[in-house]
């Protein structure tokens, strides 16, 4: 890693680095429905190829396994959902967000909050919404109404 750091500092004055946290990976969508912030169910992401959830792992058929809802107990599911909703509120997100987390031991780490998550038929949000009982049409209607509601 020393060579990489030196190469970075040859061209830049600043760098942001963070600890690598290894553990189970989860992602959890949040929507706003009738003015209320509501969590969808969490998905567990299990890499089947490679060590990172990169473009290839995300979009190739054998890159990862997505388990929706995540196979965790109700306490852990609630904790993941509450963290996702808290992140959504604290960061001032509107309408839709998705929070990615790592579970290491018994501690959850927030990796990032995505304020423009994918909405394709293979994306996390539609799969999570379906488990919560929303069709894609209903989900889109909720999102559109949420924008109208916030005005």
Model feature map: region roles:
Residues 1-82, 108-109:
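Phosphate-binding site of ATP-dependent enzymes
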Residues 73-151:
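ATP-dependent carboxylate activation and anion-phosphoryl transfer catalytic cores
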């Amino acid at each position: 890693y020393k060579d990489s750091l030196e190469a970075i500092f040859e061209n830049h004055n600043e760098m942001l680095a963070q600890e690598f946290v290894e553990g189970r990976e989860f992602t959890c969508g949040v929507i706003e429905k009738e003015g209320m912030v509501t969590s969808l169910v969490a998905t567990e992401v299990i890499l089947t190829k490679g060590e990172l959830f990169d473009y290839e792992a995300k979009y190739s058929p054998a890159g990862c396994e997505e388990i929706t809802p995540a196979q965790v107990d109700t306490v852990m599911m609630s904790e993941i959902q509450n963290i996702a909703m808290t992140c959504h509120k604290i960061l001032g997100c509107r309408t839709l967000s998705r929070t990615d987390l790592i579970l290491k031991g018994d501690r959850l780490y927030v990796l990032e909050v995505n304020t423009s998550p994918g909405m394709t038929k293979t994306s996390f949000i539609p799969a999570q919404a379906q488990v919560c009982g929303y069709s894609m049409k209903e989900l889109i209607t909720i999102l559109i109404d949420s924008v109208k509601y916030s005005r």
